[in-house]
Amino acid sequence: MIQWFLKYRPRSLKDVENQDGAKKELQEWIESWLNGKPNAKAVLLHGPPGVGKTTLAEALAHDYNLELLEMNASDSRKLQDIKGVAEKASVYGSIFGTRGKLILLDEVDGINVREDTGAIQGILELIEKTKYPIIMTANDPWNPALRELRNKTKMVGLNKLGKYPLRRLLKKICQAEKIICDDEALNYIIDTSEGDARYAINMLQGIGEGYGKVTLDLVEAMARRKERELDPFETLRDIFWARYAWQAKNAATSAQIDYDMLIRWISENIPIQYDNIEDVWRAFDALSRASIFLKRAKGGDWDLLSYAYDLMSSGVAAAEIEKKKPNWKPKWKKYQFPSYIQLLSKSKDIRDTRDEIIKKLAIHSSFNKTLNDTYPFFLIFYKKYDKRLSLNTKEKEYLNSASKS
């Protein structure tokens, strides 16, 4: 099940709308490379999310018969990763019979200069030594960390996709996918997307495939959910009910809770959501692999965190085989808090009761000294002194239980 924004992505520059200026600049730049006299070694392609930066680079490679060597700079952030791209580009010849290569470094503004030591320097070295044209993409090219990159590149800006081109695109998709979309709903999607074609198409797909039609009520409900973080119960429902990998991953990355706690929530509720034992096994298998990647990521290899998110969300969602059937419908289940949280809560309540008793004992002594020296003996003889200490019912119940254990 392919995502629609990939399925309907323009393959050629002539199909890319509303970017005439950027297309002309890129064509002149790539032709200067092919003529052996590049006017710049690298281009920094910038613009808001979803305007088609990566698409434009791919279309350029397609039209000029160039092999695209792509890397996400915010995922592969170490100096050796960047250098690896240069080595592959310079050492290995093309196996596709193309006339050359085009190197694409996506999301360079996602590099954290504190954590990803040497990444920017690695890119600068790559630009200096490259034998092939380089395109970098960024949402925010004015990030101070990119100052040196800006000085070494030709900057090409992209426009937001206008309302009319976006409307044509969405109507084309609705017609191809046989999806009924109300005009009011279409207008709402276009307005809320603010020129982000990927956002608009994902919303159209999420509602269209889930409900078979796109209405204003459904679109407004989905937009409201995107404006806030999801609570754990909403997150679970969106993961377990997801038919597409991107839907599950969006739910995981929009959760109010962190990844450690999310794994506990998912683990607790897999047997509740899935009735088939094989589905349960596949879900736990994906979750266990997510835990392994998460542990390794915490060890310093943070590139693996994205794999952990993929497995705990998309991997768990894909465990239910019935979803592949066209008439599949999600089952509503009542989820529960992780038993781990319940145990912590119960344990805290017990400790609080114990501490209140110790405070009553520790009139002429420190809390810790009373806990370690006096309290163990008090448990044996407490019935002789409970009236003096004015113990309440909860404290008496605790002492009765503690003295028997």
From Swiss-Prot:
Gene3D superfamilies listed in its UniProt record: 1.10.8.60, P-loop containing nucleotide triphosphate hydrolases
Upper lineage: Archaea, Thermoproteota, Thermoprotei, Sulfolobales, Sulfolobaceae
Any GO BP annotation: DNA replication
Family: Belongs to the activator 1 small subunits family. RfcL subfamily.
Record NCBIfam families: PRK04195.1-1 (NF003226), PRK04195.1-5 (NF003229)
UniProt name for this protein: Replication factor C large subunit
Function: Part of the RFC clamp loader complex which loads the PCNA sliding clamp onto DNA.
Quaternary context: Heteromultimer composed of small subunits (RfcS) and large subunits (RfcL).
Pfam families on file: AAA, RCF1-5-like_lid
Top-rank taxon: Archaea
Keywords linked to the UniProt accession: ATP-binding, DNA replication, Nucleotide-binding
Binding site for ATP: G47, P48, P49, G50, V51, G52, K53, T54
GO molecular function: ATP binding; ATP hydrolysis activity; DNA clamp loader activity
InterPro entries registered for this protein in UniProt: AAA+_ATPase, ATPase_AAA_core, P-loop_NTPase, Rep_factor-C_lsu, RFC_lid
